[in-house]
Amino acid sequence: MAQVPPSLQDLANRYNQAQAQLQSVLLRKQQYEAELREVDKAISEIEKLPQDAKIFKSVGNFLVQQSRDAALQELKDRKELLELHVKTLAKQESMLREQLEKLKEELNKELAKLRGGQEAAKGGG
């Protein structure tokens, strides 16, 4: 069996690294999107409540009373931050997918060269 050229091994390592990064980005993006859905649902429910409704938020092991407006503002701020995270991760996802495509093309070229060299060696004997 032929030895794998260092250039091909390097490309394969870079490809695997980029794939792992993409998986990490996708996981974080999914987590933020799930939290964003929860925040949207909470905002929707709180907006239905009367102005003087008692609202409590969890702080560690305690429930602390909060005004409706303060709760809404806190949730809207959180929503804005989550949307920013999702947008940033979507950009990273796009860049990583492009990087993976380029690395895949490079890997295929290197493999084609390697196969071509092996075919020439077999045919030339």
Swiss-Prot record:
SUPFAM superfamilies: Prefoldin
GO molecular function list: protein-folding chaperone binding; unfolded protein binding
Pfam families per record: Prefoldin_2
Gene Ontology biological process terms from the UniProt entry: chaperone-mediated protein complex assembly; protein folding
Family matches, as CDD domains: Prefoldin_beta_GimC
Superkingdom of origin: Archaea
GO CC list: cytoplasm; prefoldin complex
InterPro entries with a match to the protein in the record: PFD_beta-like, PfdB, Prefoldin
Compartments, record wording: Cytoplasm
Keywords linked to the UniProt accession: Chaperone, Cytoplasm
Biological function: Molecular chaperone capable of stabilizing a range of proteins. Seems to fulfill an ATP-independent, HSP70-like function in archaeal de novo protein folding.
Family indicated by similarity: Belongs to the prefoldin subunit beta family.
Quaternary data: Heterohexamer of two alpha and four beta subunits.
Protein name: Prefoldin subunit beta
Organism: Pyrobaculum calidifontis (strain DSM 21063 / JCM 11548 / VA1)
Gene: pfdB
